[in-house]
Amino acid sequence: MLTPVARAPLLRVFTLIALAFALVLPAKDALAQVTAFRQAVAESAARDDVLAEFYRGRDFDGMWTGATGSDRTRRNALMAAFSEAGDHGLPTSRYDPDTIMAQLRAAQTPADQGRMEVELSRLFLQYARDIQTGVLVPSQVVSHVEREVPYRSRLATITGFEQSSPAAFLRALAPTSPEYTRLMREKLRLERLMGQNGYGPTVSAGSLAPGATGASVVSLRNRLITMGYMDRSATQTYDVSMQAAVQRFQQAHGLVADGVAGASTISEVNIPLGNRLQQIIVAMERERWLNRPRGARHIWVNLTDFTARIVDNDRVTFETRTVIGATQGDRQSPEFSDVMEFMVINPSWYVPRSIIVNEYLPSLQRNSGAVSHIEITDSSGRVVNRSAVNFSQYTARTFPFSMRQPPSRGNALGQVKFMFPNP
């Protein structure tokens, strides 16, 4: 029988053993939780080579879902960026911060949190690509867009984010070109107008000329004011100020800037606000396709307004009207970006096959002396005597000749041909 004095040391031993178990069990639980989290991260990241490499480099530790201040800062910055995705015309359904935060709160187990960790990284990379270089692949939208999208390295993107100020890094992803800034500002302005009265009533008249009066003139005035082409005015007459506003509108939309609101101008003025907003969103996407350094000196050809500009250090030093291919068939001008390789002085113009067989051959069949300023050449490049050719025997498929306009002041290409590497 143990006396109380004898039992005391034994009780101390049992107490120490119990305390040791109490300390060991939580440690084991914590280790198990860490292991479950990292295992879930490893398994989820394995589906994406870039994420697998990224998380392997950090021993499958998280950077979004933890309780640390840095994790919380990254998480908040990402949710703030997602909430502004619509301002950039991006599909907001891809990154709905409310849904994502609800999923985060629902992730109670370490394994669920590990899977959510990788999902946040996947969403971050998706957002980074969308806002940097566009949601769509150009060649899959329009076949004549021969543009290589300047995709960034996904690994470099997520690694750079981890090592940077989260909010600053996310802000720097969008294009910084003046064009993109103007488009975004216009998008926000149009969205504000959508919540008001829009552009107001459409112009009912088929055409309007300076000196006109009436309800259609008032509608035209109000739409020009709302669009930003005319200062506020109460005029009910198509006066000088309205004529100048119409000219500004025409110039901005690739129309003949004569100050007369003809059928084409009225049609353009009457385009609904919602359609204008969609045009802005499309233009912003196109700007994202171009989100790469353009060089201190570059040539910018705007197909939509028929202009070509030389830009030196963000300043236009030369501007000219330019000829753009028709939208039908193979005449459409391609869209591309590349380095100019060389130029040709006093060039010859080699007529495209489509123009030869669709325009010139029918004229030559009616009159062999037609388009006399153009030479007809054989497969060796020798000039053919057109009077010796029976053009009526040929079809568009069988016509064996080429056509060339020699160098001259009247040459279709002018006196200098800048050689872009057309696709």
Predicted region positions:
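N-terminal secretory signal peptides that target proteins for export/translocation
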Residues: M1-P9
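Short amphipathic alpha-helical segments with coiled-coil-like heptad repeat character
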Residues: T3-P4, Q132, D314-T317
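Bacterial N-terminal signal peptides
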Residues: V13-V24
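Sec/Tat signal peptide C-region and signal peptidase I cleavage site
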Residues: L25-A32
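Well-ordered beta-sheet/strand-loop patches within structured domains
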Residues: A32-V50, F54-R56, V118, R122-L125, ...
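Cationic-aromatic interfacial patches
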Residues: Q33-E148
